[in-house]
Amino acid sequence: MIDKFSTELIKKNFNNAALDYSHYSLIQKYFSNRIVNQLKKLEIPEGDWYDLGSGTGFLADKIEGFSQKKVTRVDFSAKMLFKNKTKSKKLLWDLNNDLPLSNKKTSLIVSNFCLHWLNEPKLKVKNWFDLLIPGGYLIVSVPTNRCFPEWRLTCEKKNIEYSGINFLQTKELADMFLKNEIITLDT
């Protein structure tokens, strides 16, 4: 569980990084492209689209570029969120709180490398899934325990405890859904 102090520190760090974030977020860009390639294959029903943990809006921009559909960007970092100058709707929101989407018109929710920053990520995924209309899609990319092997190796060599986040395993998320409700992509 991420405590309130840590959440505020994470927010501060993202706000401070907003100016240069796009230059250094290579893995996020890679997975944004994978998400967009997957979206192009899907028939998404009419409804509202959301990018949760949107940051500077790189993924939402790419989605709008191919679909002509407006994507609401949601993030808890004001500087990240408002760095993107598009006229798309933006919602400053801490994703640790329930989303204010009670209209049951949501047909697409995407989230790219955000889930690991949240308390109770498995619960959040299930809650997001429950917001979708029938036939809607939730597409989430997450770092896994295979990420950052250099960091783990260095800790092992120095005989110190691994100090990174212990990421969810894809299987942990996949097991929450029926087989016909989920598509997993190999990394």
Specify the residue positions occupied by each region the protein language model found.
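Class I SAM-dependent methyltransferase SAM/SAH-binding core
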Residues: 49-99
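Conserved catalytic/acceptor-binding region of the Class I
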Residues: 137-187
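A short acidic, Gly/Pro-enriched loop at the edge of an enzyme's catalytic core
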Residues: 99-109
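A short glycine-rich, Lys/Arg-flanked "PGG" loop and its adjoining helix->strand segment in the class I
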Residues: 122-137
